[in-house]
């Protein structure tokens, strides 16, 4: 019974820590929306799934392509200890890239910055030409795919694993995600 009590106290402590967390601040105004791409290349906001998405800012639409750029990015978990100092890099639309390096080289940090889990001290990170600080965090994170070092698959089919982030995904949406 004593072990049970210790486990319960440990669980309660984690719950209280979670409850004390400050809500994440999100001042982004640019959102992700499904679009129809017309024959002339223009975009029209769509009601349902179309397979194409765009960044919506006020009345303008910018097609989601996946162009990610770091320009002179400076970041450190503390002001005194910079992890990245003036880094510039880019990933072209559709390009698959891998960050390879020793432990502590900044691979996971770069992924965390793209997702805005942390804010950079200076420089810019753009996504399809839009400063990511202007994009709503939920929409930014929905638009990204990543495989981190410790990859875990769940029981079930490959489709079930892909559906993990969107349980109501249709087979068509899964096929689109795989292409």
Please name every model-derived segment.
Residues 1-20:
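Cytosolic ends of transmembrane helices, especially the final helix of ABC transmembrane type-1 domains
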Residues 11, 21, 137, 141:
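ATP/adenylate-binding site constellation spanning eukaryotic-like Ser/Thr protein kinases
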């Amino acid at each position: 019974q004593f072990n049970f009590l210790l486990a319960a106290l440990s669980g309660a402590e984690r719950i209280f820590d979670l409850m004390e967390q400050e809500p994440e601040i999100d001042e982004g105004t640019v959102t992700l929306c499904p679009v129809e791409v017309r024959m002339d290349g223009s975009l029209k906001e769509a009601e349902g799934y179309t397979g194409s998405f765009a960044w919506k800012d006020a009345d303008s639409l910018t097609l989601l392509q996946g162009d990610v750029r770091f320009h002179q990015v400076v970041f450190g978990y503390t002001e005194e200890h910079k992890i990245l100092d003036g880094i510039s890099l880019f990933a072209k639309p559709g390009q698959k890239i891998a960050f390879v390096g020793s432990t502590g080289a900044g691979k996971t940090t770069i992924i965390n910055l793209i997702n805005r889990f942390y804010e950079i001290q200076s420089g810019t990170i753009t996504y399809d030409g839009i400063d990511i600080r202007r994009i709503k965090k939920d929409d930014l994170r929905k638009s990204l795919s990543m495989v981190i070092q410790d990859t875990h698959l769940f029981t079930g089919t490959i489709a079930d694993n892909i559906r993990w982030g969107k349980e109501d995904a249709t087979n068509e949406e899964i096929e689109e995600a795989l292409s």
